[in-house]
C-alpha cells in the first residue's frame, strides 16, 4: 500500500477505537456505573497494569473478564486510550516520513524522470 493509504487506514483504525471507547462510556452511563477518573480508588492500580512492560492478554485478563461490568468496561477504556495514543504517535511518524520521503506516486514519477534523464 502507499504511504497515503497507510496513513488513512491507520486514522480509520484510531477513529474506530475512539467510537468503541465512547460506546463503553455510554454503557457505563446507561447503567449508572462510574467512568474512572484520576480520583477513583482503582485508577492508580489500573494505570500500573496498563503501563506494564511486555504486557500480554494475561496481564489484563482479570480486568477484562471481570464479572463486574464497571471494572471490565473501565479496563477496556484504559486499553483503548493507550492504543489510540500509540496510533496517534504512529500517524505523526508516518506523516513526517511522507513529507520527507514522499509517497509512492512521487517516487515513481522521480524514477521515470531519472530514467528519461539517463536516456539522453
Language model features: what each stretch is:
Residues 1-120:
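Amphipathic alpha-helical assembly/interaction segments
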Amino acid at each position: 500500500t502507499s504511504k497515503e493509504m497507510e496513513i488513512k487506514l491507520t486514522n480509520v483504525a484510531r477513529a474506530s477505537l475512539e467510537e468503541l471507547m465512547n460506546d463503553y462510556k455510554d454503557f457505563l452511563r446507561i447503567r449508572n456505573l462510574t467512568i474512572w477518573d484520576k480520583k477513583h480508588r482503582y485508577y492508580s492500580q489500573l494505570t500500573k497494569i496498563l503501563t506494564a512492560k511486555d504486557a500480554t492478554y494475561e496481564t489484563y485478563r482479570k480486568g477484562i473478564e471481570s464479572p463486574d461490568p464497571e471494572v471490565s468496561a473501565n479496563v477496556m477504556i484504559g486499553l483503548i486510550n493507550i492504543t489510540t495514543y500509540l496510533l496517534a504517535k504512529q500517524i505523526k511518524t508516518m506523516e513526517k516520513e511522507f513529507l520527507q520521503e514522499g509517497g509512492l506516486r512521487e517516487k515513481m514519477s522521480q524514477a521515470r524522470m531519472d530514467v528519461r534523464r539517463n536516456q539522453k
